[in-house]
Amino acid sequence: MDNKKIRNFAIIAHIDHGKSTLADRILEFTNTVSKRDLKEQHLDSMDLEKERGITIKLNAVQIRYNSYIFHLIDTPGHVDFTYEVSRSLAATEGALLLVDASQGIQAQTLANVYLALENNLEIIPIINKIDLPSANVDKVKAEIENTIGISAENAILISAKNGIGIEKVLEAIVNLIPPPQASDEKDPLKALVFDSYFDIYRGVIIFIRVVTGKISVGDTFKFMANNLKFSVIELGISSPNQVKKEALFAGEVGWVAASIRNAKDVEVGDTITLVENPAKSPLPGYKKLVPVMYTGFYPVDSQQYNLLKDSLEKISLSDSSIIYEPESSKALGFGFRIGFLGLLHMEILQERLEREFNLSIIATAPSVEFQITRTNGQVQIISNPSLFPEPNFISEIREPYILAKIFLPEEFLGQIMGLCQDKRGIYVDLEYIDDFRRRLIYKLPLVEVIFDFFDRLKSLSKGYASFEYEVIDYQVSKLQKLDILLNGQKIDALSMIVHKDFAYPKARDLTQKLKEIIPRHSFEVPVQAVIGSKVIARETIKAYRKDVTAKLYGGDVTRRKKLLEKQKAGKKRMKSFGVVDVPQEAFLAILKTNINEK
């Protein structure tokens, strides 16, 4: 295959800007998929992706256009999935920057464009949805030039939905995106592993971009990070269905099956090379992202613990950003502490476990990693609030802070600044992008952002604000552990870390919510919020009362009293031994409480 005829590219776009639709039109226009077989969001393979209208997993597909071969790597657009975007961009030479003509550039688009610029990719600006009445092409062109600093004079105007301008996009890919670097077949193999998934018959299938050399069926290769060796049984390309080949050459994107049975053997972002003629060093520039929040996942049925363990292992193959370890809770039994990139990431994993593996999951409230200095000088990093030491053993607590960049229309500036102040934010800067749009920069505690910040941001701005963030440092904060007691028993899975100034309103709000959510029992259940040994808020869930006197037909009043006394004694006994049922909604209530309402 002539290297000069290959083009590798990704599509960068915010959610709902039409990325999956553009991918569909490209597949249709080039006859990669026949019109009869094409379905909406063709590259989005999960039902979840289609239902939510988002791309979660990245996909790679080979497209033939005239005498050229394109490798389109479809990427997610949500802030939680930046990890997936960084992988796909590392495997390409160019990117289509897709911007909605009515909404303009959003924060996440910008974050991904900067990733592309860091990778020295050729960027082609494309303005989509030009047929909408609210489209403002000139304004969007000016925005692209002012915020990104690339020329938008020759931006391609399209309507992906109606197929307008698709041919111009294909011609631009040919003319503007550079071909992969030429490489001799005899050069040592270097190939970037940018994705993987588990096939029950063939083991782990890895997706690779060959940078130098070639890889053939029968070759023995090794992963450079862990030195594990495997032999190629099958390899090929996706078009978009898998097509087997004998070899993959420099510049090509394809899949490799090598009977890899253990999920942990594959590290996405690793470099593979041949055992016979190995490369001296791996490919540069790959960064592994660290989870920003941690949550406990427990099976409702404790018998399903092993099924949950196996399911997590299988899912972690196709989502390498998930990190998990076993943990136990007095209230919930055995489960796992799982690291995520954000709340959407967590919701999607829970839905996948429930749909694909028929598991019922209880998820505890998310937390972040805190740095705790004990009074003896020892420093601990703890992400599970129930493992916090007692207050008298803590010298100081440091929490992670983020730098948040919020894009918003000027009319919502006041409300959004108010939201940031509520979340203990520190004002950094305000930039004027144009006459209508502003970029607000705040330092915020990460623990405040992972709860309901994104929802409230969208709600206050009617959906027009968007934001991106990066974790910058740890800062000392006045934090305390808030425990919840139900019927005098500490429920470790409901423990949380709160700021001293907001502990009381948070406790009051949470106890009221738990009172509404936890079903009534046949005995009275006190709900208490405590810090250390001090109760700072209390509610009582009233008992429901069975009418034990219903079967009496008049007669002696002492008989009635005797039955009521017997019921009272029974309830007293139940109260001391009774188990309180805590539904999943109780753990979610922690997310929904208005943390900082004083």
From Swiss-Prot:
Residue ranges annotated for the tr-type G domain, each copy included: 4-181
Subcellular localization: Cell membrane
Database matches in InterPro entries: EF-4, EFG_III/V, EFG_V-like, EFTu-like_2, G_TR_CS, LepA_C_sf, LepA_CTD, LepA_IV
NCBIfam families: lepA, small_GTP
HAMAP family given in the database record: LepA (MF_00071)
Annotated binding of GTP, by residue: D16, H17, G18, K19, S20, T21, N128, K129, I130, D131
Keywords: Cell membrane, GTP-binding, Hydrolase, Membrane, Nucleotide-binding, Protein biosynthesis
SUPFAM superfamilies registered for this protein in UniProt: EF-G C-terminal domain-like, P-loop containing nucleoside triphosphate hydrolases, Translation proteins
Bilayer topology annotation: Peripheral membrane protein
Gene Ontology biological process terms in this record: positive regulation of translation
Assigned GO CC terms: plasma membrane
Protein name in the entry: Elongation factor 4
Family, similarity comment: Belongs to the TRAFAC class translation factor GTPase superfamily. Classic translation factor GTPase family. LepA subfamily.
Record gene name: lepA
Chief place where the protein resides: membrane
UniProt xrefs under Pfam families: EFG_C, GTP_EFTU, GTP_EFTU_D2, LepA_C
PROSITE patterns linked: G_TR_1, G_TR_2
Any GO MF annotation of the entry: translation elongation factor activity
Catalytic activity from the UniProt record: GTP + H2O = GDP + phosphate + H(+)
